Amino acid sequence: EYYYYNKEELLKAPKIPLIVMEDNAAVFKSMADEMVEEIKRKNALGENTVFICPVGPVGQYPYFVDMVNEQNISLKNVWFINMDEYLTDDKEWIDKEDKLSFRGFMDRTVYTKIKPELVMPEEQRIFPDPKNLTHIQDMIKKLGGVDICFGGIGINGHVAFNEASDTMTPDEFLAQHTRVLEISKETRAVNSIGDLNGALDDMPHYCITIGINEIAHARKIRLGCFRDW
C-alpha cells in the first residue's frame, strides 16, 4: 500500500525518519552538504573521516567536488569505502575502463576532479575485493568504524547489492558481510535501462557488495531516494 501513499500519508507515521525535499537536486545537495560538514568537523578534531559511498545515487558528487575545491577542504584524512562493483563471469572486477565500472566512475567523476593537493591518497579509496572478502571489515575495524553510510534504494529494496530474501530472518540478513553475489534479474534489467539503453545481455551477472552488517553498524545512515520507488 505504500506505493499509493501521497506525501502527507507517508510522513504521518513513517517507520524510519523521513525528509521530503523539493526535488532530486535538493536530495543530492543535502547529501553533499552532510559529507562536507562531517569532514570539516572531523578535520577540526584531528580525526579520520570514514564514509561508505555509493555509485547510485551519484548526483551528490559534483556538488561535493565543487565545495571541496572552492573551500580548499583537505581529504588527506578521509576514507571512501565504496559499496560495490560489478564482476566478470570469472568473479573478477570488470575492467576499470569499462563504462559500467564503479571504480572507473569514481576516478573520472570524483578523484580526478579534486585538486591534487586536497584529494585523499589512492590507498584511502577502497572497494570490496573478491580476492579478499574480509578487507572491508578489517579496514572498518582498524579505522574505528564508519561515520556515515550514504546510499540509495534499488527497485526491489536493495541497498548496495544486498537484497532481502524470503528464506532469511532479519537477524540473518543483518549478519551478512562482504560477499560475491549473482545479481537479480530485476536489478540487471533496471540497470541495463539506465546504463546501457536496455542492452540486458551486456549487463554483468555478478557483483561484489559490502554487507548489510557493515552498513547497519555505521554511526549514521543516509539513503537518498530519487526515483519512483
Located regions from the model:
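Glycine-rich phosphate-binding loop
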Residues: 144-169
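N-terminal glycine-/serine-/threonine-rich phosphate-binding loop
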Residues: 1-51
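Glycine-rich N-terminal segment of FAD-binding domains in flavoprotein oxidoreductases
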Residues: 40-72
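Class I SAM-dependent methyltransferase SAM-binding "motif I" and its flanking Rossmann-like core
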Residues: 160-210
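C-terminal functional extensions of proteins
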Residues: 199-229
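A glycine- and small-aliphatic-rich helix-loop capping segment at beta-alpha/alpha-beta transitions
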Residues: 65-74, 97-98, 164-173
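Ligand-binding beta-strand-loop-alpha-helix segment within the catalytic cores
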Residues: 2-15, 26, 73-150, 202
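Gly/Ser/Thr-rich loops at beta-strand to alpha-helix junctions
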Residues: 51-60, 155-158, 227-229
